[in-house]
Regions:
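Multi-pass alpha-helical transmembrane bundle typical of ion/small-solute transporters
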Residues: 1-332
């Protein structure tokens, strides 16, 4: 088998592994609130999330184009060795944070891995700093927006339903949480699965297998399937952190968090902007908790999560740089 074909197959395999890990790593984003409030049985929640993640992943390719075309100046600055190294850095980081039950951003991990590998390969001239700035800005702004809008959504719900008894409210919102969890799962797939689509398409472009950056249908199906399979495996360690350690959720607050998260994420998808679903969901829960009372949020846990988020890009950049040297040693 020619070396280029071997490299392309390696990229596709690692990208699908990244998507699979992203699925079980980020399953918590789609179902943590509905499981923690017992609106859905865990197994039912996972089946629903897997199916809707698949449908969401097939929705569009705008985010894939942003990831594949905006981090580097052109496909000439990226070869398969760089892409493999970036994926290794992202996969290793995701596994580390999953093992320690720390909600982390797969988006940050992938961006950091690409930056580190490109810097070692061709230097800073290969990076599109305008595109990177746009991506990083969306990653930073999205959880802050989620906090504010989550607080507003919860405040509105309190105003509308505040005169009813808690038991009556929570009984109704338990059923509505099924809908909000479904919306969350679809929006998660519509944004997160596209990141690996963008990486695979970039590899196909740099290898000369396609002439323009358009995501092939088979790439969409492969990425969507990998995400759905990962979702079916589930990430129970992180579900516990997101579902209960930040703020004790009730059905009404769980509904508000899911509704808000799905709106923020899907809006980003329509704008072709990659966001961290982990950050957005966590931000929504913080905002919902703040609407109840500020000290209801466990800010110590939130601070630990923010620390992990801040460290993700620099750590994965280093991992991507080291992995690039390793990949060169293996393939050259």
């Amino acid at each position: 088998m020619p070396e280029l074909q071997l490299l392309i197959f390696t990229v596709i395999g690692l990208a699908l592994l990244f998507d699979f890990i992203n699925g079980f790593h980020d399953t918590a984003n789609a179902i943590a609130t509905s499981v923690s409030t017992r609106a859905l049985h865990p197994s039912h929640a996972i089946i629903m999330a897997a199916f809707l993640n698949f449908l969401g992943a097939m929705y569009s390719t705008g985010v894939a184009k942003t990831i594949g075309a905006d981090i580097v100046k052109s496909a000439q600055h990226v070869d398969e060795h760089v892409i493999i190294a970036a994926l290794i850095g992202a996969v290793v980081w995701n596994l580390i944070t999953w093992w320690f039950a720390v909600p982390s951003s797969s988006s940050h991990a992938l961006v950091g891995g690409v930056i580190g590998a490109v810097l070692v390969s061709v230097g800073s001239d290969g990076l599109n700093f305008y595109g990177i700035g746009k991506i990083v800005l969306s990653l930073i702004a999205s959880p802050l927006i989620a906090i504010v809008t989550g607080c507003l959504v919860m405040t509105v719900l309190f105003r509308i339903f505040g005169r009813f008894s808690p038991s009556a409210i929570n009984g109704k919102f338990k059923k509505m949480q099924i809908l909000s969890a479904a919306m969350m799962a679809f929006s998660h797939g519509s944004n997160d699965a596209q990141k690996s689509m963008g990486i695979i398409t970039l590899a196909l472009l740099s290898g000369g297998y396609i002439d323009v950056f358009e995501v092939p249908t088979y790439v969409k199906v492969l990425a969507a399937t990998a995400m759905a399979c990962g979702t079916a495996v589930g990430g129970w360690r992180i579900i516990k952190t997101i579902g209960g350690k930040i703020f004790k959720l009730e059905p009404i607050s769980g509904f508000a968090a899911d509704l808000n998260s799905s709106m923020v994420i899907f809006s980003a998808t329509l704008l072709h902007l990659p966001v961290s679903t982990t950050h957005v969901v966590s931000g929504s829960i913080m905002g919902v908790g703040t609407a109840k009372r500020v000290n209801a949020v466990r800010w110590g846990v939130a601070q630990q999560m923010v620390t992990a988020w801040v460290l993700t890009i620099p750590c994965t950049a280093v991992m991507g740089a080291v992995a690039y040297q390793f990949v060169l040693w293996i393939f050259k």
